Amino acid sequence: NSISQLAGKKVATTTGTTSVQLLRKHEKANGVNFDEVFGKDHADSFLLLESGRADAFVMDGSILAGNIANAKNPKDFKIVGEVLSTEPIAIMVPKNDPEFKAAVNAAIAKMVANGRMPALWDKWFLKPIPPKNVVVGLELSPATKNAWANLNDKPAEDYAQKK
């Protein structure tokens, strides 16, 4: 369950995503050679795996979990291996509108404090989603819990640094 096990395999990811850069970085750093295959979007990348044209699909856990939940045979797939990166998810606001930014930050902080954020996580990742009642099945990670406990404006580069 490590990236070294991808040696000689066909590894799918989605064109234009940070996963492409991440795969190449790990390939170079670890001396692991694999064949990259690209999907035009996440559904296409998953189809490469589902149809046997790829041996693995590297992407964000939430995207992988969603694709697995909606697969023809979800039990045929699982998320394995090490976390390859931690990347912040953010809300983009106009650069020169500090009042709006403050309002957005306050709304997020309130949602975390009053339990709405974890309730939304449960709704979209742990409970059946109508109309097909698909359950994504993605548990809340320690990294996400920590991010909610420590809301900030740190740039993505700060998350890549090992502490």
Q: How would you name each of these model-derived features?
A:
Residues G61, A69-N105, K127-L151:
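Periplasmic-binding protein-like
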Residues K10, T15-T17, A65, A90-P130:
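Extended ligand-binding regions for polar small-molecule ligands
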Residues I3, V20-R24, H42-F46, E50, ...:
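Extracytoplasmic/secreted envelope proteins and their assembly/folding machinery
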Residues A147-K163:
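Short, low-complexity, Pro/Ser/Thr/Gly-rich segments in the mature regions of secreted, periplasmic
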Residues K9-A12, E50-D60, K75:
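Alpha-to-beta junction loops
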